[in-house]
């Protein structure tokens, strides 16, 4: 597919694309279109392998195996597991960084503090950790998490957070995981040349790894971030490029980890920092949220120094092209290799993770918990100096800006229900809320203009009285589209509209990042436990209408293992094998209760998800 005409669902991006394109600057849309005729049809189906020196091999009807003898199903699923491993590795890296930060904070070595003491005590109690001293508890929790993620035995975190019926099933299927590091070792060693070529075996190992990823690494890291930075609670903020004001010193925080961003906010809230910015000629200094780092902060922080979120990963080039950003602090995930080119717009690109390096940018201010304040101060000094040099007359002040409501963690949802989950359950039983769909998605150009499919499917779902929980880059898409605002209530079906007005909530609940998949699974567990049913029986489904990268694939595998019907688009690279397609879309449902549904038309996808939910309701007799 080639993107022509409107490149994005959002007018701000369409406008900035026109500017960048006219100036002849490399950008994601033009690069995507340039690749249209060069894409390998074998790769798109998962039928190309480059693992060993005997290849590359491509499978076709007249050449049904690779040189080693692997068939289409084995090749397709093995290729898919490689993507899944990368997603697991990134989530696990983040979890270890969170645990290290918690321990260093407990030892008094960071700029942070234990912000949610009750969450710490709750988590420690679940882990079987006792003690009265807050810092001692925090240190023990950090040690527990690091140990469990490395465990050779069954994961204690999975034991604690997974539903009983799921644990029994996973044991029966042989996919109950050990620590996530061990799962990575098993998966990686299996997916080498001439080791495991059985597509069912590879898929089961991927499921085991996905459970360790989402029910251990993800839940642990988000809980730790709640402990350190506060559990998300509903509050208003802003989205879209209009949050960028060229008259301010603007520091963008980009990636998936909130650590440096939170340190920047803590410093920016000091009057002497704001005064320093004003002396440089600025109105003040602001922190600007980009993609998941911005989303992590957005869910937790309500501060005048945090301007909000510009959008998801496809937005970053166009946001920098406004000429409003002074420093772009890049942590793990989703920093485009093209960004050094965008320094022509007056921004300084600074990696703040050892994972991130770019062409011509060989060094960074790599995050270490003990150095967070020092790193943040250096970034602020860089930004203020950059502001003095930046040509404000060339900056573009974008008008589009949305007021949004964010911060709907499980605790926040319970609070909105006055602490009584039965309010939600009764609404579902009566049909006022037909069901719930978790929208956990990236953004891509592969299936149409930027964010178009995501916005369309969300609008269709709420119109059908289906409540949406939004996570990931898809969450930012819906924020910029205004669907996480109270104004969006008018777009909902009559029954859902009444519920939203009664509870004072939007029809799309801004739940967090892709890392909140585990947190969403825990909320689903609470609902299943309250109803006394297993997860697959619930009128709940998942959609990833614009999945893009490796974190998304491991999240999807987990959703299926958890027992949820999971819609994905664009078409994943598994279609080269009928056996593999049948495994993911049919056979697995007989084992876990979950399955993959592939549909690129967002309207048809919404219809399919509604049908799934109605079938679940009928089976429950509601």
Swiss-Prot record:
<dbReference type="GO" id="GO:0051539">
    <property type="term" value="F:4 iron, 4 sulfur cluster binding"/>
</dbReference>
<feature type="binding site">
    <location>
        <position position="57"/>
    </location>
    <ligand>
        <name>[4Fe-4S] cluster 2</name>
    </ligand>
</feature>
<feature type="binding site">
    <location>
        <position position="68"/>
    </location>
    <ligand>
        <name>[4Fe-4S] cluster 2</name>
    </ligand>
</feature>
<feature type="binding site">
    <location>
        <position position="514"/>
    </location>
    <ligand>
        <name>[Ni-4Fe-5S] cluster</name>
    </ligand>
</feature>
<dbReference type="GO" id="GO:0042542">
    <property type="term" value="P:response to hydrogen peroxide"/>
</dbReference>
<dbReference type="InterPro" id="IPR010047">
    <property type="entry name" value="CODH"/>
</dbReference>
<dbReference type="Pfam" id="PF03063">
    <property type="entry name" value="Prismane"/>
</dbReference>
<feature type="binding site">
    <location>
        <position position="334"/>
    </location>
    <ligand>
        <name>[Ni-4Fe-5S] cluster</name>
    </ligand>
</feature>
<keyword id="KW-0408">Iron</keyword>
<feature type="binding site">
    <location>
        <position position="473"/>
    </location>
    <ligand>
        <name>[Ni-4Fe-5S] cluster</name>
    </ligand>
</feature>
<protein>
    <recommendedName>
        <fullName>Carbon monoxide dehydrogenase</fullName>
        <ecNumber>1.2.7.4</ecNumber>
    </recommendedName>
</protein>
<dbReference type="GO" id="GO:0016151">
    <property type="term" value="F:nickel cation binding"/>
</dbReference>
<feature type="binding site">
    <location>
        <position position="256"/>
    </location>
    <ligand>
        <name>[Ni-4Fe-5S] cluster</name>
    </ligand>
</feature>
<keyword id="KW-0004">4Fe-4S</keyword>
<dbReference type="InterPro" id="IPR016099">
    <property type="entry name" value="Prismane-like_a/b-sand"/>
</dbReference>
<feature type="binding site">
    <location>
        <position position="49"/>
    </location>
    <ligand>
        <name>[4Fe-4S] cluster 2</name>
    </ligand>
</feature>
<dbReference type="GO" id="GO:0004601">
    <property type="term" value="F:peroxidase activity"/>
</dbReference>
<comment type="function">
    <text>CODH oxidizes carbon monoxide coupled, via CooF, to the reduction of a hydrogen cation by a hydrogenase (possibly CooH).</text>
</comment>
<feature type="binding site">
    <location>
        <position position="442"/>
    </location>
    <ligand>
        <name>[Ni-4Fe-5S] cluster</name>
    </ligand>
</feature>
<feature type="binding site">
    <location>
        <position position="52"/>
    </location>
    <ligand>
        <name>[4Fe-4S] cluster 2</name>
    </ligand>
</feature>
<keyword id="KW-0533">Nickel</keyword>
<comment type="similarity">
    <text>Belongs to the Ni-containing carbon monoxide dehydrogenase family.</text>
</comment>
<dbReference type="InterPro" id="IPR011254">
    <property type="entry name" value="Prismane-like_sf"/>
</dbReference>
<dbReference type="GO" id="GO:0006091">
    <property type="term" value="P:generation of precursor metabolites and energy"/>
</dbReference>
<dbReference type="GO" id="GO:0043885">
    <property type="term" value="F:anaerobic carbon-monoxide dehydrogenase activity"/>
</dbReference>
<keyword id="KW-0560">Oxidoreductase</keyword>
<dbReference type="InterPro" id="IPR016101">
    <property type="entry name" value="CO_DH_a-bundle"/>
</dbReference>
<comment type="subunit">
    <text>Homodimer.</text>
</comment>
<feature type="binding site">
    <location>
        <position position="40"/>
    </location>
    <ligand>
        <name>[4Fe-4S] cluster 1</name>
    </ligand>
</feature>
<dbReference type="InterPro" id="IPR004137">
    <property type="entry name" value="HCP/CODH"/>
</dbReference>
<keyword id="KW-0411">Iron-sulfur</keyword>
<dbReference type="GO" id="GO:0050418">
    <property type="term" value="F:hydroxylamine reductase activity"/>
</dbReference>
<keyword id="KW-0479">Metal-binding</keyword>
């Amino acid at each position: 597919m080639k993107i022509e005409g409107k490149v994005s669902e959002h007018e701000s991006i369409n406008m900035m694309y026109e500017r960048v394109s006219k100036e002849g600057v490399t950008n994601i849309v033009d690069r995507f279109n340039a690749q249209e005729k060069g894409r390998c049809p074998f790769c798109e189906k998962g039928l190309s392998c480059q693992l060993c020196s005997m290849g590359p091999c491509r499978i076709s009807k007249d050449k049904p195996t690779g040189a080693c003898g692997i068939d289409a199903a084995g090749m397709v699923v093995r290729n898919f597991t490689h993507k899944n491993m990368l997603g697991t590795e990134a989530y696990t890296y983040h979890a270890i960084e969170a645990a290290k930060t918690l321990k260093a904070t407990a030892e008094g070595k960071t700029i942070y503090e234990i912000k949610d003491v009750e969450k710490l005590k709750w988590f420690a109690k679940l882990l079987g950790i006792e003690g009265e001293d807050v810092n001692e508890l925090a240190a023990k929790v950090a040690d527990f998490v690091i140990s469990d993620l490395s465990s050779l035995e069954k994961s204690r975190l999975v034991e604690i957070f997974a539903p009983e019926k799921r644990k029994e099933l996973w044991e029966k299927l042989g996919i109950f995981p050990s620590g996530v590091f061990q799962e990575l070792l098993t998966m990686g060693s299996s997916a080498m040349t001439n080791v495991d070529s059985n597509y069912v075996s590879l898929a089961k190992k991927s499921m085991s790894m996905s459970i360790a990823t989402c029910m251990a690494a993800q839940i642990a890291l988000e809980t730790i971030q709640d402990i350190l930075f506060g559990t998300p609670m509903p509050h208003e903020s802003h989205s879209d490029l209009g949050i960028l004001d060229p008259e301010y010193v603007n520091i963008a925080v980009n990636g998936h980890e909130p650590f440096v961003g939170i340190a920047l906010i803590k410093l920016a809230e000091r009057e002497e920092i704001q005064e320093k910015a004003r002396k440089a000629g600025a109105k003040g200094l602001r922190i600007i949220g980009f993609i998941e780092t911005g989303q992590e902060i957005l869910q937790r922080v309500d501060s005048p120094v945090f301007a909000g979120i510009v959008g998801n990963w496809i937005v970053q080039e166009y946001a920098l092209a406004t000429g409003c950003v002074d420093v772009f602090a890049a942590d793990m995930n989703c920093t485009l290799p093209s960004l050094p080119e965008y320094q022509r717009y007056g921004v300084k690109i600074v990696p703040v993770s050892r994972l991130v390096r770019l062409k011509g940018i060989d060094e960074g201010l790599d995050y270490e918990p003990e150095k967070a304040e020092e790193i943040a101060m250096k970034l602020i000094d860089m930004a203020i100096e950059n502001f003095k040099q930046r040509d404000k007359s060339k900056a573009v002040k974008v008008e589009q800006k949305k007021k949004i409501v964010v911060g709907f963690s499980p605790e926040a949802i319970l609070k909105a229900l006055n602490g009584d989950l039965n309010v939600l359950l009764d609404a579902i039983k009566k049909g006022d809320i037909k069901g719930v769909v978790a929208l956990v998605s990236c953004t891509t150009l592969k299936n149409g203009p930027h964010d178009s499919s995501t916005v369309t499917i969300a609008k269709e779902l709420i119109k059908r009285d289906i409540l949406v929980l939004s996570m990931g880059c898809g969450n930012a898409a819906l924020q910029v589209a205004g669907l996480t605002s109270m104004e969006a209530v008018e777009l909902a079906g009559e029954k859902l509209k009444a519920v939203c007005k009664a509870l004072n909530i939007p029809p799309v609940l801004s739940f967090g990042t892709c890392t909140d998949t585990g947190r969403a699974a825990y909320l689903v567990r609470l609902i299943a436990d309250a109803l006394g049913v297993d997860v697959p029986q619930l009128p709940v489904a998942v959609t990833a209408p614009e999945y893009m990268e490796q974190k998304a694939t491991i999240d999807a595998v987990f959703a299926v293992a958890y027992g949820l019907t999971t819609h994905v688009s664009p078409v994943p690279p598994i279609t080269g094998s009928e056996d593999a397609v049948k495994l993911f879309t049919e056979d697995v449902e007989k084992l876990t209760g979950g399955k993959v549904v592939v549909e690129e038309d967002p309207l048809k996808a919404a219809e399919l998800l509604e049908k799934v939910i109605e079938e679940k309701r009928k089976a429950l007799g509601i």
